[in-house]
Amino acid sequence: GRWVEAVSEMAAFADAGAVPGEVTVDISAGRLLPPITAPGKRIYAAANYGDHIREMLNAGTARNDAERDDMLDRDKTRVRPYSFLKAPSALSGAHDDIILPSDSTKVDWEVELAMVVSRRTKRIAAENAMDCIAGFMTTNDVSARDWNMREDWVTLRTDWFGGKSHDTFAPVS
């Protein structure tokens, strides 16, 4: 779509010599917006970093070290990632304030690598995946961890949307 066209236009602009060798911009008087202000959807992959999984299990999911190690071993055999979405209102700029919910005492964050998909695609073969990648950004996955676990819903237990989709909980740069 438009992303591919814009990248081509920027490359042509640069190739034509229209950009001086060094360009500087004073950003102190402005606000850095997210590089993509209205993404179609943002899919996050949870539990993709071993040390963080271990940290979270030690923080309360596992009752002891043996149970934690058993959970980690079981997770290694999974093929499909545990995915979740964030609300559009969670998107914010890299230097915007993160608004903390007044009734949460366990706000936490993780730095993540965000991949920008350049066009609509479904079930693409792994060997063709990079053909659909426009680039990469950094983001923070901010969570109200005390909202993620739902003791009032014993059968479901988790509400990741409620814990991770507060306004400003997805700053991007």
Predicted segment positions?
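N-terminal non-catalytic cap/leader segment that marks the start of a structured domain
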Residues: 1-82, 104
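Solvent-exposed alpha-helices and their adjacent loops that cap or buttress functional pockets
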Residues: 34-38, 73-77, 83, 90-92, ...
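Flexible glycine-rich active-site/ligand-binding loops centered on an Asp-His dyad
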Residues: 66, 79, 85-86, 128-154
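Ligand-binding beta-strand-loop-alpha-helix segment within the catalytic cores
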Residues: 86, 96, 111-113
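Active-site glycine-rich loop that binds ribose-phosphate moieties when present
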Residues: 91-103, 117-123
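Residues embedded in well-ordered beta-strands
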Residues: 112-116, 137
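Functionally critical, mid-to-C-terminal surface segments that flank or help form catalytic/ligand
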Residues: 160-173
